[in-house]
Amino acid sequence: MLREAGFESISTETLLSSRQNPAVLPARPFMITFDDGASGLWRYADPLLKQYGFRGVAFTITGRVDTHYPYYLTWDELTALQETGRWDIESHTHQGHDRIPSGGDRQTPFLINLIQRPDGRLETQQEARERVAADADQAINQLTSHGLPQPRLFAYPFSAESNPTNNPEFAVASRKILAQRYPLLMINVDTPRWASSGDLTAGLVPRIEVTKQTTARALFDRIVAALPAPQMETRPASR
């Protein structure tokens, strides 16, 4: 459906370049992203991308590569994906795709909350900043030390960029730490919309979440509905 309707998948490089030069974008650009680094990317997604002439972005939890096999990719498989020329390997934290104790019985996202220590003390903002920075640096180091390009995109685990948090000030600080390392950060949004020049300037790009319950037709309709008005006319035949 997407190819027939004139959509073209783009790379990290094209997305980043479009901030200064929108003319690098095709008429109907979109980006296909996958989170976590599950082995299904190699087994199922890559053959389909090859078949349809699309490319993908793998947001990888580097601390889980080569673990719990066969669920997560190995480093060899991740490298093989990169070498196809169809994939960009990007960051989804090192060990930060977890929920942490943040007070009472709450378990909340690692990146935007202060951890409650076993003695009941909440970590300080400085401790939390150091924790987030160390995780971000380790994710980058893991990818580059395995011969992969330095990541330039980051997808928030759970799409938790500002909520739920036990310290809004720290959530803002955490975003700044990530933005110092990655030119663009990504989150899922409930209402599909096209990424705007304002989003790219702000460094926070919206995504449409796709689950196993999402049909091809439903996804296509959501993408088309998010298009700027002049582009909403062309649709492929129903199937």
Where are these regions (language model features)?
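Solvent-exposed loop/turn segments at secondary-structure junctions
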Residues: 16-17, 36-40, 63-67, 94-99, ...
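A short acidic, amphipathic alpha-helical/loop segment
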Residues: 44-48, 77, 173
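N-terminal pre-catalytic segment of deacetylase/amide-hydrolase enzymes
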Residues: 1-29, 192, 203-207, 211-212, ...
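Aromatic- and glycine-enriched glycan-recognition loops and surfaces
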Residues: 1-4, 37-39, 71-76
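Membrane-embedded segments
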Residues: 14, 27-29, 33, 41-45
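Conserved beta-strand->loop/alpha-helix structural units within folded catalytic cores of enzymes
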Residues: 35-36, 57
